[in-house]
Amino acid sequence: MMDFELEGQNFVVTGAARGIGLAISRRLTELGASVSGWDLDQDAMSGESLFHHRMRVDVSDEKSVNDAAEATLSHFEIIHGLVANAGVNGPTKPVWEYSLEEWDKVISVDLTGVFLTSRAFLNHFRDQDYGRLLIVASVAGKEGNPGASPYGAAKAGVIGYAKGLARELLPSKITVNCLAPAITETELFEEMSESYIQEKKSRIPMGRFCTTEEIADMAAWVVSPRCSFTTGQIFDLTGGRATY
């Protein structure tokens, strides 16, 4: 168990129904926080008692996000942090086989979704001069992944977005950081070919995939009051794949 608590803290986690988002939500709750879980798939969250609040949200839709933010703020009154995790991987194939519709879906969820959800809470954070924005990016945003170029483009975009936004908010007590995990064994594997998965595993020097629990532990520290002097940073969880 970690040696700090998040008692009395309220967080929004997008893409909270499963995988990384669910693991982060669980860890925050274990540390005493209250979590509003945002996801399109409310059925997947129906059996999870860890959520204090749930919203069906399409993060790529401006009205859906703004309505959910208003309802969440009305419920909690104070939000201490947002974990922007919702994402899609998209098909694994070369760019010349991608349709514009497939490209747009990845960008709208993985990049525009981060903009919309973070913007919805920024004035609240600014009014209280405190907030933690954590974006779940990917090592693909630093190195690119052949077969998933739109995904890499979106994740590179959120890394640049986080660095710029972090500086815009200085010298406030609002921090903006990213996590950049290597491939993690979640339900997104269902969208990937076996050859793609094995090729990505071969690029991890530790010889295994990242776990959702490892990501959740890192996330809990980054969104805590203890992580108070770090902003605009990318925290890698890559098993040695990326060391920069």
Predicted regions, residues:
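Short C-terminal tail/terminal secondary-structure segment
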Residues: 2, 89-92, 143, 220, ...
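Substrate-binding pocket helix/loop in short-chain dehydrogenase/reductase
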Residues: 93-95, 102-107, 189, 200
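Active-site loop immediately N-terminal to the catalytic Tyr-X3-Lys motif
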Residues: 96, 143-149, 171-172, 207, ...
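Active-site loop-to-helix junction immediately N-terminal to the catalytic Tyr of the SDR YXXXK motif
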Residues: 98, 144-152, 164, 192
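Active-site helix of classical SDR
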Residues: 118, 154, 162
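Alpha-helical segment proximal to the catalytic Tyr-Lys
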Residues: 123, 167-171, 228
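Residue(s) in the substrate-gating loop at a strand-loop-helix junction
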Residues: 138
